[in-house]
């Protein structure tokens, strides 16, 4: 069956291109694009709160590597059979992060550890920094979901809905045909039509992004409460999407593990929103110590002020001659 069914939209013919021996993967490019978008948006939000935009990029040098490692570790922990189970892909495949497989929960958790280390170096509060970065993170997640589209992965159950996603068989360089081939090229042969769950989550993430921008502009959410709002909102969307997915996943009591994670993380985020301090941090508390020292001069001591005053009085006094004094008295 090779014809395009009316109303359905096709998956991309490939997810990787080659420049000589160098593979260019759409998934990796979109992850990089998402990181750049998160830094641009986060830098502007941080500056709007009173911080220095450059600090965002400095802390990213800590947060991004930690986040990538955390995302991969979460994926390996929750899908370990794919790599280390019977007939698993092995350690080499586990290290190939560019092939896909990042768990957002691990990325956020370990990314926060990296951000905490960066914030300590710059002497700024982590919760406030998280608030500024939250809109950028959810936007990066939306962009990253396009990588799943190119990889033909993380889709839902088969469907006859008019917006279904057509998944085609792909043939890899060795001649093996599989719809899940990351290095293959589409043969045009339709494998199945599925729910485009990547698209559902992408749309949800974009809506959350605009909602966070609106809330950040019109409400004084600080002390990590905007970041917790992002986490709670994402959990709602992710929980609903997990109900539609049908790809291989670890289950607990017949429920996908990401559904459990979404539930417990959502509860934790709501509790944090309730218990965290109200209001927002003062702008002067969001700057590095050396930046504040440059902008705000140290007050003069009493001795220095007295010295300046006496010097000013001495230099401005005008001597009066005897003739001028006599003229004034007459």
Curated annotation (Swiss-Prot):
Which keywords belong to this entry?
A: Cell membrane, Membrane, Transferase, Transmembrane, Transmembrane helix
Q: What is its main location?
A: membrane
Which parts of the chain span the membrane according to its record? Answer: 22-42, 57-77, 97-117, 193-213, 257-277
Pathway involvement? Answer: Protein modification; lipoprotein biosynthesis (diacylglyceryl transfer)
Q: Where in the cell is it found?
A: Cell membrane
Q: What is its EC number?
A: 2.5.1.145
Annotated GO molecular function terms are: phosphatidylglycerol-prolipoprotein diacylglyceryl transferase activity
The way it spans or sits in the membrane comes to: Multi-pass membrane protein
Q: Which InterPro entries match?
A: Lgt
User: Which family does this protein fall into?
Assistant: Belongs to the Lgt family.
Q: What is this protein called?
A: Phosphatidylglycerol--prolipoprotein diacylglyceryl transferase
Q: Which organism is it from?
A: Mycobacterium leprae (strain TN)
């Amino acid at each position: 069956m090779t014809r395009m069914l009316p109303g359905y939209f096709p998956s991309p013919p490939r997810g990787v291109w080659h420049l000589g021996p160098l593979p260019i993967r759409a998934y990796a490019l979109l992850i990089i694009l998402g990181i750049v978008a998160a830094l641009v948006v986060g830098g502007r939000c941080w500056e709007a709160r009173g911080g220095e935009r450059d600090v965002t990029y400095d802390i990213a040098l800590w947060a991004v590597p930690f986040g990538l490692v955390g995302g991969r570790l979460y994926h390996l922990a929750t899908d370990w059979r794919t790599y280390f189970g019977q007939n698993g892909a092995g350690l080499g495949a586990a290290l190939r992060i560019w092939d896909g497989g990042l768990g957002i929960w691990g990325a956020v958790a370990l990314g926060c550890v990296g951000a905490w280390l960066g914030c300590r170096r710059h002497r700024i509060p982590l919760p406030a920094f998280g608030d500024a970065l939250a809109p950028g993170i959810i936007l990066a997640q939306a962009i990253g979901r396009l990588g799943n589209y190119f990889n033909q992965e993380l889709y839902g159950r088969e469907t006859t809905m008019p917006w279904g996603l057509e998944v085609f068989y792909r043939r890899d360089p060795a001649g093996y045909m599989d719809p899940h081939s990351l290095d293959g090229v589409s043969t045009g042969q339709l494998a199945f039509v599925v729910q485009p769950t990547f698209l559902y989550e992408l749309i949800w993430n974009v809506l959350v992004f605009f909602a966070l921008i609106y809330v950040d502009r019109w409400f004084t959410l600080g002390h990590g409460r905007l970041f917790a709002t992002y986490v709670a909102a994402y959990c709602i969307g992710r929980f609903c999407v997990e109900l539609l997915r049908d790809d291989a996943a670890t289950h607990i009591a017949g429920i996908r593990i990401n559904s459990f994670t979404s539930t417990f993380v959502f509860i934790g985020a709501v509790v944090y929103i309730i218990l965290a301090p109200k209001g927002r941090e003062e702008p002067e508390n969001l700057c590095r110590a050396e930046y504040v020292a440059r902008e705000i001069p140290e007050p003069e001591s009493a001795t220095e002020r007295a010295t300046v005053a006496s010097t000013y009085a001495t230099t401005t006094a005008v001597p009066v001659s005897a003739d001028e004094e006599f003229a004034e008295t007459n």
